[in-house]
């Protein structure tokens, strides 16, 4: 099995501080993928720190549990997480990194990578699935930011 990579680089129409706050809320991933994630369970000792784990339950194509660990971050710049243990996803050894930088006060450049070994599924389909999800998170973040500001 070869390691594969999914990558998305795009400009997101939200301030960097907003993007970072939402991304770093490791326990709140369901708010960014509400139609994909059925539930997220957090251990009692969760502190949103490096090494913390979230249990994500999917309900669409890949139904089941994904256990993710927050591996590291540099405040307002970079975050890394990985899938640990068994997963309902068609991958092994998944590690993701997200880098962000401000382009101006209202826009953020996002560089999102996922590295993994694909299981039995079509490799290109798996790469595309992760790209789709990275883009969906960015799209949802833009929509939620716009919606929250239109209510003011």
What name fits each language-model region?
Residues 27, 31, 40-89, 136, ...:
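Glycine-rich portal/gate segments that line the openings of hydrophobic small-molecule binding cavities
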Residues 50, 80-83, 105-114:
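Short, well-ordered strand-loop elements centered on a beta-strand within folded domains, enriched
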Residues 12-14, 85-87, 100-102, 116-120:
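Beta-strand elements of well-folded, non-transmembrane domains
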Residues 16-17, 71-77, 99-109, 148:
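A short, structured loop/turn motif at beta-sheet edges
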Residues 2, 90-97:
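Amphipathic hydrophobic-ligand
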Residues 1-46:
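Hydrophobic ligand-binding cavity/cleft-lining segments
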Residues 8-10, 66-72, 94-102:
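Hydrophobic/aromatic beta-strand elements that line small-molecule binding cavities or substrate pockets
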Residues 109, 114-152:
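A conserved amphipathic terminal alpha-helix motif
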């Amino acid at each position: 099995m070869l390691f594969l990579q999914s990558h998305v680089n795009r400009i997101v129409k939200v301030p960097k501080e907003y993007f970072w706050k939402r991304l770093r809320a490791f326990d709140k991933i369901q708010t960014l993928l509400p139609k994909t994630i059925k539930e997220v369970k957090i251990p009692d000792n969760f502190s949103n720190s490096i090494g913390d784990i979230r249990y994500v339950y999917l309900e669409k194509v890949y139904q089941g549990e994904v256990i993710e660990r927050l591996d590291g971050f540099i405040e307002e710049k970079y975050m890394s997480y990985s899938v640990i243990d068994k997963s309902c996803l068609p991958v092994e050894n998944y590690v993701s990194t997200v880098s962000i930088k401000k382009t101006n006060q209202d826009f953020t450049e996002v560089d999102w990578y996922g590295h993994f070994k694909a299981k039995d599924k079509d490799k290109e389909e798996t790469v595309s699935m992760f790209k789709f999800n990275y883009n969906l998170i960015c799209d949802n973040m833009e929509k939620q930011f716009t919606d929250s500001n239109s209510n003011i």
